């Protein structure tokens, strides 16, 4: 039977998992075990859901760690002077390398609602870093329209931010 798993459903599932894993009253653990070879077709074997298989899994664990906090993340896109950003479009699937959100130097995250254009209608580079935490969309002097999304706290940055990824809210 075919199933449609939409991006919205995937996000809902991830949100539920994050909520469960961040619930300190019911701790979650992650385990690492030995690797086992699969068949030559690189297809994972179907679990048998037996007590024997569960025991074999537990015996192959090499370490476990209690999860203390988790966060969803997205690729980190630092706002850079002279970069062309694209306005968010809910009709587009998969943005590829087109950036439509930015992280500023004070860890505020903004979404680009409309890219700046010149008189000929060509996209122009962003030259004014968005700032402020008002929830209303605003236009910067370079013609870009931005909307503030959230700010990443220092604690969240230390825990979840890397050079490649940043936490979401």
What are these regions (language model features)?
Residues 1-169:
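Tryptophan-rich substrate-binding surfaces of secreted polymer-degrading and adhesive proteins
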């Amino acid at each position: 039977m075919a199933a449609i798993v939409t991006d919205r459903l995937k996000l809902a599932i991830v949100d539920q998992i994050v909520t469960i894993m961040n619930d300190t009253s019911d701790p979650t653990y992650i385990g690492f075990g030995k690797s086992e070879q699969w068949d030559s077709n690189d297809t994972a074997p179907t679990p048998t859901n037996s007590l024997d298989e569960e025991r074999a899994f537990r015996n192959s664990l090499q370490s476990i760690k209690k999860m203390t906090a988790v966060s969803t993340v997205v690729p980190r896109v630092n706002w850079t002077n002279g970069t062309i950003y694209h306005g968010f479009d809910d009709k587009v699937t998969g943005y590829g390398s087109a950036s439509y959100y930015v992280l500023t130097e004070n860890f505020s995250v903004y979404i680009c609602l409309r890219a700046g254009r010149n008189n000929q209608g060509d996209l122009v580079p962003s030259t004014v870093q968005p700032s402020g935490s008002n929830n209303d969309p605003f236009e910067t002097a370079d013609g870009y329209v931005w909307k503030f999304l959230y700010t990443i706290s220092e604690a969240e940055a230390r825990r979840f931010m890397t050079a490649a990824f940043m936490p979401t809210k």
